[in-house]
Amino acid sequence: IADNAKIMTLRIHPGEGEPYLKDMALAIRYAVNHGADVIVLPEQNSIYPKEQKQWVSEALKEAEKKGALVIVPVWDLSVDMDKDEFFPNRKMNKEGELTNFMVVASSDKNGNPVLNTNYGATTLDIYAPGTDIYSSYMGDTYQKGSGEGMASATLAGVAALVKSYFPKLTGSQIRDILLKSATSRKGVEVEKGIRVDDRPSQDLF
């Protein structure tokens, strides 16, 4: 999507189980201190110990101050996130709601939510294409993949494209542009269902 973007890979997943939240917080700080404009985190989780939640919250606030956009995909649990809280989220910081933070879920080719995705009228920001996405794979090959990870990568690509045309935009401003240029999905079952459509963003150029 954004051909000239540079990718910074920071591994925080141990290979099995869930990522260590201290490593996630340190990775966020490292990324923003080394010029990252768009940060993609692992899927949200419902288990966030209080002290570790504070580490991540402070790192996210630092990313907001440095002008980076932070994207996190939902889990595939068919859970209403307005009723069951998942982390990280934009309301977890004591200083106020994060303005640079986006929660994304996967949509199919028709822009509808995929089966089993988490949802929420106030806690989910946007849907992005995440079904049958052709991407790089192991062994210098390419193949199609589906899932929330693909959706977050799609959203990150569009955000990077906007940033490449307007480098002075902050993460908060890019978030606002993406939300306002998304295609409305009022007819679907999930409330406030919208998906990424990069064409309205491109029309700005």
Regions found by a protein language model. Give the residues of each.
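Active-site-proximal beta-strand/loop segments in catalytic clefts of secreted hydrolases
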Residues: 2-5, 10-14, 28, 41-46, ...
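Extracellular S/T/G-rich loop segment that most often corresponds to the catalytic His/Ser-adjacent loop
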Residues: 65, 91-164, 168
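C-terminal subdomain of the subtilisin-like protease fold in secreted/lumenal serine endopeptidases
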Residues: 36-41, 100-103, 166-205
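Proline-centered loop/turn at the N-terminus of a beta-strand
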Residues: 6, 37, 67-69, 102, ...
